[in-house]
Amino acid sequence: MTLKELITRIQPLDEAAMEAARRRQDALAKPPRSLGRLEDLSIQLAGITGKVQNTMDKTHLLVFAADNGVVEEGVSSAPQSVTLMQTVNLTRAKTGASVLCKHFGAGITVCDVGVNAIVREPAVLDRKIAFGTQNIAKGPAMTREQAEKAILIGAQLAMDTPADALGVGEMGIGNTTTSSAVLAVLLGVPVETVTGRGGGITDESFQKKKQVIAQAIALNQPNGKDPVDVLQKVGGFDLAAMCGAFLGAAASHRPVVIDGFISVVAALCAARLCPTARDYFVPSHLSYEIGYRLALEELRLEPIFQLSMRLGEGSGCPLAFQVLSAACGIINDMATFDQAGIDDGYLEEIREGDKFTVEAQK
């Protein structure tokens, strides 16, 4: 499968199924739009799957692990060895994301696409492209061939994973640096507006981080109109594979949950490659990282939660899976007005005037 073939598999949402879901929601025994975002999600799910009634019996988080050569520049407080340790711990329900997956019964797959070490844990899926990327402050992160390979690895894993919904997470020291670089280029904005402190760094290191990102962009001159070029020159193997996972989920007609900052940048890359893919995305939480909101605004999406989270790993995805499940439960199991023995004639005027929309309350 080529990248072009992958993109051609992604189809627009099923408008007929969405309209049927809207009619079903209007027929349920409740004031119009009174379940708000849950109704919106159920309609989105109908468009994604082509079915009005869906389930979230099986949900799965995909975590892509890789190291980033830019850590040589002192942009992270954590040593690079943490990537390997946490990659292994993710498979043992010992990290934030994996504990949440275990708690809610979601599956998790950890995929090594570029850890700078030999990963001896059998539970980690080996798709290593190289032992980390090159230092973007000194040259391109990878070759274009490697970037496309990473995208297709992520896409194939998403398509091969049986689940009603997928989530996309990561593990890689230094990846807020690469994500900020990619986002700055895609949006054409100053580095300072999209660069946060990541896992936590001193003021001196924070200034260094911004300088390194600006230096990397100036040196490599990525083309902001070509997401693959941007990923190749200032991105990471994890980011590229995550981008592919978003595309793969859309190509296989499954909703795919965005986690935090790295995840939303990967989602934006996917949407730039195939704008239709955006309609399959479900943002989980409003990350505390500074660039997250800008990326989400560019995608024209709204997060479900605001929990001041900034862990990454995919930690927001298991929480969002529960909301998707609730959205399915509402449209599947609530009684209609007819079933409840209620005459809903009194709502006709309200329905026609959209008196229960958020805008109508202002």
Task: Please state what every model-predicted region is.
Residues 2-362:
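N-terminal loops that bind phosphate or other acidic moieties
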